[in-house]
Amino acid sequence: MKTVVFAYHDMGCLGIEALLAAGYEISAIFTHTDNPGEKAFYGSVARLAAERGIPVYAPDDVNHPLWVERIAQLSPDVIFSFYYRHLIHDKILQLAPAGAFNLHGSLLPKYRGRAPLNWVLVNGETETGVTLHRMVKRADAGAIVAQLRIAIAPDDIAITLHHKLCHAARQLLEQTLPAIKDGNILEIAQCENEATCFGRRTPEDSFLEWHKSAAVLHNMVRAVADPWPGAFSYVGNQKFTVWSSRVHSHAPAAQPGSVISVAPLLIACGDGALEIVTGQAGGGITMQGSQLAQTLGLVQGSRLNSQPACAARRRTRVLILGVNGFIGNHLTERLLREDHYEVYGLDIGSDAISRFLNHPHFHFVEGDISIHSEWIEYHVKKCDVVLPLVAIATPIEYTRNPLRVFELDFEENLRIIRYCVKYRKRIIFPSTSEVYGMCSDKYFDEDHSNLIVGPVNKPRWIYSVSKQLLDRVIWAYGEKEGLQFTLFRPFNWMGPRLDNLNAARIGSSRAITQLILNLVEGSPIKLIDGGKQKRCFTDIRDGIEALYRIIENAGNRCDGEIINIGNPENEASIEELGEMLLASFEKHPLRHYFPPFAGFRVVESSSYYGKGYQDVEHRKPSIRNARRCLDWEPKIDMQETIDETLDFFLRTVDLTDKPS
């Protein structure tokens, strides 16, 4: 039976050996070049392939059409993947009549994704395993063919668990590969309700946060012990690594991070204390805890910290362009609530941020991004994080002023992106749910959903494609020039200060503001094309909390990611939104100041938005990236958001001339 193999690491080597022992004919092996920054303690797939006389390749992009064609010419009967690090395109998987199978180091459906070996230890699991499953378009989601369980001992560390997994994988493959060859396998679908997914880990993820419990920190040490990079902390500006540790449940009470004793080296935690059994100062040698304490100059009462002291002293400088806008002013409020941010802002007005103007860590300049280019370039260079939030984002403007939308949303933002590349600054860019366009997926997925827009003669799409092209430019700068970036896609955020009723009067506002204006003025609520279009409405507080976590970027998990920020549970049609808003309006204590409700009126989109408009029937986000990268879930119910948004706008109305 002919096979093509994708393999890396020890698991790749043992998988190849198992295939050969089972009588498979391996036509080619695809692997990776070794990362010079990674400690190579594992077997070489390339060397094994060469010794066995099997053609071996390590392309940068195995999914490139040229490689897909070359694999097709090999005519594999079956495909196997053993710890290959890149997602293999469905076009390749479909080349094998018997299908494609992947070996994964966890008990699927739990711990899908990357580094399951390390994650199970981080999370203190007592059991894991290996799974052979059929490969499908979604990573690690195919039917299970075989599975072996492994107990995790309390003294297991990453390398001992790795050896256990390798031993189990050999057993599993020895039992299962002949059955696959004979076409005699039983497949069990994975239970999606039990699925969990984890992202890649980097050395920076393993800092010890002393406010956590000693048990949690001990698990971190176990998860990344040698030959992995190790858990670390700081004494002042000096970094040190903890290679092994021990939990002390009953220890004297002390401030987390304080040295309780130096022999043994015992550090107070949020709960209990952690004994550093062995460790290493900087680039030195490994030594026992008491010697490490002496080397680091620690005494009883000394304090450790999770980051260098110099980093802790300086506030992170955040540049927000469009700081007076809906997202900008709420984000400013969230950042200033903490004591480690300095916010620099630019906008053409200041009504929404007037409450911050006297704050010592808020610096505002009134100006236009198309004019104040020198100020912007200087502050991009000066700041650590850049959020270019300036955009025309109201649908009526897409058809009314398409060229202005392009000039502001694309051209001006491209200049800012290039400044970030020039000065090597981190950019957090507001993409949009609009980029998905008329995608037919049930859930819009950042990494897999197609971005589908209408024809050129529908100018309504100029906003969507401007944003999409900027997304692609940023991604390319990240790949080719090392730009540190995160793209976030808001899904219908709403709340107080969304826009204003004056904007609604000229049709240049979001849907809920327009509906509130209709109620305030006693005019009919217009339902465009019947108002059956569905959206997932997200409370601004939920959205801002997610955006704040992107800025925090714990363990650099947000770098290079695209993250939907929306609430898939708050799905409603525009008609349903209007009905919920009306019910809230009728119960409001200021209701008697306003005219009677004038009813709903169905209007055609062309008469409201003008020629060249197309609508989208549904827009529901997948939030798996937000869960994985941010540990975030939306919490606020749509009705609460509607009530608070309505109350805010009603209290902005001048009631002096209204009858009481």
UniProtKB/Swiss-Prot annotation:
An example GO biological process term is: lipopolysaccharide biosynthetic process
Region of interest (Dehydrogenase ArnADH), ranges: 314-660
The pathway where this protein functions is: Nucleotide-sugar biosynthesis; UDP-4-deoxy-4-formamido-beta-L-arabinose biosynthesis; UDP-4-deoxy-4-formamido-beta-L-arabinose from UDP-alpha-D-glucuronate: step 1/3; Nucleotide-sugar biosynthesis; UDP-4-deoxy-4-formamido-beta-L-arabinose biosynthesis; UDP-4-deoxy-4-formamido-beta-L-arabinose from UDP-alpha-D-glucuronate: step 3/3; Bacterial outer membrane biogenesis; lipopolysaccharide biosynthesis
Residues reported in the UniProt entry to bind (6R)-10-formyltetrahydrofolate: H86, L87, I88, R114, V136, K137, R138, A139, D140
Q: Where is this site: Raises pKa of active site His?
A: D140
Superkingdom assignment: Bacteria
What family does this belong to? In the N-terminal section; belongs to the Fmt family. UDP-L-Ara4N formyltransferase subfamily.
Cited function: Bifunctional enzyme that catalyzes the oxidative decarboxylation of UDP-glucuronic acid (UDP-GlcUA) to UDP-4-keto-arabinose (UDP-Ara4O) and the addition of a formyl group to UDP-4-amino-4-deoxy-L-arabinose (UDP-L-Ara4N) to form UDP-L-4-formamido-arabinose (UDP-L-Ara4FN). The modified arabinose is attached to lipid A and is required for resistance to polymyxin and cationic antimicrobial peptides.
Question: What protein does this entry describe?
Answer: Bifunctional polymyxin resistance protein ArnA
Q: Which organism is it from?
A: Escherichia coli (strain SMS-3-5 / SECEC)
